UniProtKB/Swiss-Prot annotation:
A biological process from GO: methylation
Family: Belongs to the methyltransferase superfamily.
Gene3D superfamilies, alphabetized: Vaccinia Virus protein VP39
Keywords tagged on the record: Methyltransferase, Transferase
GO MF annotation, one: S-adenosylmethionine-dependent methyltransferase activity
EC number: 2.1.1.-
PANTHER family: 2-METHOXY-6-POLYPRENYL-1,4-BENZOQUINOL METHYLASE, MITOCHONDRIAL, METHYLTRANSFERASE
Domain of life: Bacteria
Protein name listed in UniProt: Uncharacterized methyltransferase MAV_4945
Residues forming coiled coils: none
Amino acid sequence: MTDIFARRATLARSVRLLSQFRYERSEPARFYGALAADTAAMVDDLWRAGHGESAAGRTLLDVGGGPGYFAAAFADAGVRYLGVEPDPGEMHAAGPVVAADTGTFVRASGMALPFADDSVDICLSSNVAEHVPRPWQLGAEMLRVTRPGGLAVLSYTVWLGPFGGHEMGLTHYLGGSRAAARYARKHGHPAKNNYGSSLFEVSVADGLAWAACTGAELAAFPRYHPRWAWWLTSVPVLREFLVSNLVLVLQPQ
C-alpha cells in the first residue's frame, strides 16, 4: 500500500516540508499550501497503490478541512472535494486567497459526520485528531462514511513529539496544564490550541491499537519522515518522541 508513496518519502521532501513550518503564522498560505499539495500527492500515491489508477474523479471527504487550502490542492488533482469544519472562523480564514468553487463545505463535527454510510471513496483527516476529545470516535465516523474498498487516511500530531505542544512550543514536556498556564501568562490570553479544550494528548500507541482493533488497517507510518526512518513507528516509547506525526491508512471491507 505504501510502495509508491515510499519512493517520494525522501530526506529532501522531509527537509522541504519542515522548512515550511516557520511560515505557519506569518504566511499561512505558503505553509498550508505546501502541506496541502504534499497531502494530495500522498493520498493519490496511496490510492494508486491499492487501485492501480489515479484518485482523479473520486470523491474525498476532508474532516477538519479548514479554510480551503486542501480543497484547492485536491481540485488541482481532479478530486471531488467535500470539506467538513466545525469552526466558521476557520472556514473563512483564507479569505479570497482560495477560490470558492474548489469544493463543497459543510459546517459539522468530525465526531458526528452528517453523511450516509459508505458515501465517499476517500475520507481524510489531517492534523485534527489531537484537537478533539474523542479521536477514535472521529476515526470510527471516517470508516463509517467510507465505501468498502475505499481509503480512510487519518493523520495526527503526536503529543510527545516535538510539535505536540503546537504554539506552546516544547513547554508541553512540562505537562499540558502547566504549559497552557505558562502560555496564557506570557501572552495575556490562552493559546488557540489550548490544552484540555482544543488540544489533547494522542499517542502513537493509542493510534496503532485503535487501527488494529478496527480490522481495516493497511499501513501506519510517520508522515514527515524519510522512508528509511519509518522503522521508528515500531519501537515503543521511542516512537512517542520521534514520530512527530502518525499516518494511519485503513480500508473498510
